[in-house]
Amino acid sequence: MSNDTPFDALWQRMLARGWTPVSESRLDDWLTQAPDGVVLLSSDPKRTPEVSDNPVMIGELLREFPDYTWQVAIADLEQSEAIGDRFGVFRFPATLVFTGGNYRGVLNGIHPWAELINLMRGLVEPQQERAS
């Protein structure tokens, strides 16, 4: 992929981080190798500029949860749509979260830092019963 479009440049930056490209047809295989993982789904940065911020935010977010052996997969524009369809995701950027090979949920869009941490905590930490 050349750097002809904003997404091409973003794609190259994500590859430079060592993140794994994944397709909808290979996602299940990837999850067997990376049971604690996130999959970054994107859209055209010209249409949705916050897509360019998502890799930075997610990279930092994963450091806040060191009890997991996080792996990161990335999907190109076409595969983002296919994977998004599979998981009912229609708002991008989106990050699918898996722990122990199980789908835990999705982080859609960009959020303030404290809110993002709380959203992720709700996905990955065991639910504790609360007294009513």
Swiss-Prot record:
GO molecular function: signal sequence binding
InterPro entries to which the protein is assigned, alphabetical: NiFe-hyd_mat_HyaE, Thioredoxin-like_sf
SUPFAM superfamilies to which the protein is assigned, alphabetical: Thioredoxin-like
Pfam families recorded: HyaE
Main function: Not known. Could form, along with HyaD, a complex involved in the processing of the hydrogenase 1 structural operon.
Annotated family: Belongs to the HupG/HyaE family.
Protein name (database record): Hydrogenase-1 operon protein HyaE
Organism ancestry: Bacteria, Pseudomonadati, Pseudomonadota, Gammaproteobacteria, Enterobacterales
